[in-house]
């Protein structure tokens, strides 16, 4: 939030520099993201008085002799401007001066005549008419006649000022205004706060009745409105234009400027309804009807539903509550009567409507952080005072103040000095704490038993208990008073990883050893990601938990699979020119027992693996899984299964000890064709994905791996080339071979062949077998017996022949 230094000085007698105030604000918990000097980039620009003028023959230029006081009484400068006259005072950039935008002015010849600087326009100094009158005139900026030659230009045109760009935390919505920051400045400097004038006098009766009602008090705890007749549109005074300009707003008209000024100064959003456009002279705060439409002041049309709070007349919505007014009720040059609105709207209601409609404003930003119920009272009074001060209209006696029935009371907190100091860990004198709280507009009533009855200001909704009081005390007392000390506990527990964390770290290291890089994605995506994977409607993955207030529609549901996010990461890499890669992610997915949810969903730890590139294949992922199995002392079995997003002929399910862990394989061709990547990438890319239930995997691990001595006897190797049907999987063959004998210690597939000589629907798969016995050498007879049994079992169970 931008706060001008000069505006703060209207509330507090500040006797420190802007830089010193920045440090003090930081010390009491307010981060000044940037302190912006208005004269940034301007140097050696002074007031110059034109004492001689002469047209430069044959050119459009005028030769001027300028009196710049101590910098020289006869500085010769040529200019192309034509709006000045003899005796005028103008901004003069001297030789070697700088202007905003990094422009440096040097003495040079203009049309053959030496010019020792430049006479400036308002725009060249970064000014506009709202900051300094006449700045937007075509030509030079003409300064007041009493300007003194040689004076630095900054104070003359109001550039001797600073803008504090302050980050307001969510717990301090009361500081979303110049007044809110001024309260803090007054407290930290120990100065009195000068409140802005809020007195006004009703001068006439209403000319016709107005009906105001609130049908949704749970979303609008307080609604205030005041009727003003005989509106007189005009220009705002210079001081108001300057306030608005310093905060980044342009002046529109006196009445519009008053609503914007009240927002900035008091932190209270306001709106004014043109009563000539309000049907039935009725204002109704209610939930929108299904399908109702509104066109807002920025000419955007929205279709509404009962989740949206609106301000309506007798026929239609005329404003989105807390966000923006409607184009059908806004003021214009023909406006003669206005109803000024100040209200408190529920922050959740404003935030949800703003997000759902994609409509934001300065008002909605404040309501989303919170506007207290006391604020409308101050805001409306200040606005009415300004209306009377600027003679914008005639204030009537008709005012409305509708509430949800709750009394407007200060919060009372019972505390003791010992409790507050106990939270802080230091001793602060009682009177010092009382003084600090009183400077922050708390009242402290010391009870007979020594306890304090502390009343919080009406605008401090964030203060609820004595630890909050401790925070207020230490903010002003100074965090530097807290002396670092060691904990005096009897024992200290050393930190470390627990079993699950160690297993996860081991998993990541095993995959990293296979050249896989870890990815990290958000826990949200949208149904579009599930659609992309062709997941059917009845699949469990479709039972996704919807976010009530999503950041965007693309992040609207909690993930039930990691694969969609992994595929998005792969696509992003391909778009950015990364033609190959290996990735993994270990993260929870969120599974609901039923929808809508009525209990906390199960967060299942899941492992997802992805590999992409022209050289990647099925065995890249399978090899990574085998490395995991070996690392944890497990044996994986593979069965022919697939998933909606995988190629039905190049995929498999992973099992361990009879438990299904997950599925992996090549991305289905039809999904690959739909990816938003270049056609040549689709044709050359191989994308493989795998997703495992990590919790099921860890349940198969039986404690820590222990050292097992290598057999002193060398294993016997045998290769088998087998002919089988296309439907037979590698996993089925491996399982049959291993079950034939305990002597089989290793089975590896090393070749697959298809050819006409094998016959239609046939393929050849070659396996390398290792046979070993830790106690003795395996004899040739034993090898022959095991091989015969393997071939017999393969033929009987799977119809496989030796090639």
Task: Place the predicted regions along the sequence by residue.
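A carboxyl-terminal module marker
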Residues: 2, 20, 439-442, 462, ...
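Class II aminoacyl-tRNA synthetase-like tRNA-binding/catalytic domains
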Residues: 108, 284-324, 328-331, 488-603, ...
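Glycine/proline-enriched, intrinsically flexible loops and inter-domain linkers
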Residues: 5, 23, 53-55, 189, ...
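Conserved mixed alpha/beta core segments that line enzyme active sites in large multi-domain catalysts
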Residues: 33, 47-78, 246, 259-328
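Phosphate-backbone binding interfaces of nucleic-acid-interacting proteins
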Residues: 1-202, 206, 339, 358, ...
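Terminal amphipathic helices with adjacent charged low-complexity linkers/tails
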Residues: 185, 189-214, 391-420
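Mobile "lid/hinge" segments at catalytic clefts and subdomain interfaces of large enzymes
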Residues: 114-130, 135-140, 154, 162, ...
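Extended, well-folded interaction surfaces typified by the phenylalanyl-tRNA synthetase beta subunit core
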Residues: 180, 413-579, 718, 770-774, ...
């Amino acid at each position: 939030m931008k706060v001008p230094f000069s505006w703060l000085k209207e509330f507090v007698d500040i006797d420190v520099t802007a830089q010193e105030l920045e440090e003090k604000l930081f010390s009491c918990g307010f981060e000044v993201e940037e302190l912006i000097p208005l004269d940034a980039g301007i140097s050696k620009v002074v007031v110059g008085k034109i004492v001689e003028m002469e047209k430069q023959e044959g050119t459009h230029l005028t030769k001027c002799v300028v009196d710049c006081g101590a910098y020289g009484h006869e500085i010769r400068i040529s200019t192309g401007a034509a709006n000045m006259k003899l005796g005028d005072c103008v901004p003069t950039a001297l030789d070697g001066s700088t202007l905003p935008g990094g422009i440096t002015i040097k003495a040079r010849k203009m049309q053959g005549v030496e010019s020792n600087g430049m006479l400036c326009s308002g725009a060249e100094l970064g000014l506009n008419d709202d900051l300094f009158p006449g700045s937007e005139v075509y030509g030079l900026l003409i300064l007041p006649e009493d300007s003194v030659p040689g004076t630095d230009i900054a104070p003359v045109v109001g550039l001797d000022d600073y803008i504090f760009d302050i980050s307001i935390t969510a717990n301090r919505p009361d500081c979303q205004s110049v007044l809110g920051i001024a309260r803090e400045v007054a407290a930290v400097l120990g100065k009195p706060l000068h409140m802005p004038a809020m007195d006004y006098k009703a001068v006439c009766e209403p000319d016709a009745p107005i009906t105001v009602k609130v049908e949704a008090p749970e979303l609008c705890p307080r609604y205030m409105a005041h009727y003003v007749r005989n509106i007189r549109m005009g220009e705002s005074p210079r001081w108001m234009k300057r306030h608005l300009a310093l905060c980044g707003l342009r002046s529109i008209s006196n009445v519009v400027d008053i609503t914007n000024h009240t927002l900035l100064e008091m932190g209270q959003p306001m709106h004014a309804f043109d009563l000539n456009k309000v049907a039935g002279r009725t204002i109704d705060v209610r939930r929108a009807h299904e399908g109702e439409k509104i066109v807002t002041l920025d000419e955007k049309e929205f279709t509404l539903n009962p989740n949206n709070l609106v301000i309506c007349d007798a026929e239609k919505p005329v404003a989105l509550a807390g966000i923006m007014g409607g184009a059908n009720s806004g003021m214009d040059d023909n406006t003669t009567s206005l109803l000024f609105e100040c209200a408190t709207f529920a922050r959740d209601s404003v935030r949800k409507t703003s997000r759902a409609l994609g409509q934001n404003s300065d008002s909605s930003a404040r309501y989303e952080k919170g506007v207290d119920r006391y604020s409308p009272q101050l805001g409306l009074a200040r606005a009415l005072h300004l209306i009377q001060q600027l003679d914008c209209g005639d204030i009537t006696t008709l005012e409305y103040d509708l509430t949800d029935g709750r009394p407007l009371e200060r919060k009372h907190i019972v505390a003791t000095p010992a409790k507050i100091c106990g939270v802080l860990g230091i001793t602060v004198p009682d009177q010092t704490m009382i003084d600090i709280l009183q400077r922050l507009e708390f009242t402290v009533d010391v009870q007979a038993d020594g306890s304090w009855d502390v009343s919080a200001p009406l605008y401090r909704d964030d203060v609820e208990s004595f630890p909050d009081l401790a925070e207020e005390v230490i903010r002003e007392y100074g965090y530097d008073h807290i002396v670092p000390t060691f904990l005096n506990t009897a024992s200290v527990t050393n930190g470390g990883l627990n079993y699950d964390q160690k297993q996860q770290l081991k998993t990541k290291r095993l995959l990293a050893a296979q050249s896989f890089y870890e990815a990290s994605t958000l826990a949200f995506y949208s149904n579009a990601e599930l659609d992309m994977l062709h997941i059917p409607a009845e699949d469990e993955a479709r039972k996704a938990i919807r976010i009530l207030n999503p950041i965007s529609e693309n992040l609207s549901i909690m993930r039930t699979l990691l694969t969609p996010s992994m595929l998005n990461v792969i696509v992003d890499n391909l778009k950015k020119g990364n033609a190959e890669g290996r990735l993994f992610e270990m993260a929870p997915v969120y599974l609901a027992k039923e929808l809508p949810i009525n209990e906390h969903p199960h967060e299942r730890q899941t492992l997802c693996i992805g590999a992409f590139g022209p050289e990647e294949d099925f065995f890249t992922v399978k090899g990574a899984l085998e490395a995991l199995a070996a690392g944890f002392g497990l044996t994986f079995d593979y069965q022919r299964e697939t998933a909606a997003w995988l190629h039905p002929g190049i995929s498999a399910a992973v099992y361990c000890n009879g438990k299904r862990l997950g599925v992996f394989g090549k991305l289905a061709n039809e999904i690959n064709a739909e990816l938003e990547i270049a056609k040549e990438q689709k044709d050359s890319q191989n994308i493989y994905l795998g997703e495992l239930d990590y919790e099921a995997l860890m349940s198969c691990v039986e404690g820590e791996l222990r050292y097992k001595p290598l057999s002193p006897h060398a294993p016997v190797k045998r290769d088998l080339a087998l002919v089988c049907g296309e439907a037979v999987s590698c996993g089925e063959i491996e399982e049959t071979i291993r079950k034939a004998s305990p002597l089989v210690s290793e089975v590896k597939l090393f070749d697959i062949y298809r050819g006409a000589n094998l016959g239609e629907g046939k393929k050849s798969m070659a396996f390398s077998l290792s046979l070993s016995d830790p106690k003795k050498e395996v004899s040739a007879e034993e090898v022959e017996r095991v091989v015969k049994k393997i071939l017999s079992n393969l033929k009987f169970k799977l119809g496989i022949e030796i090639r």
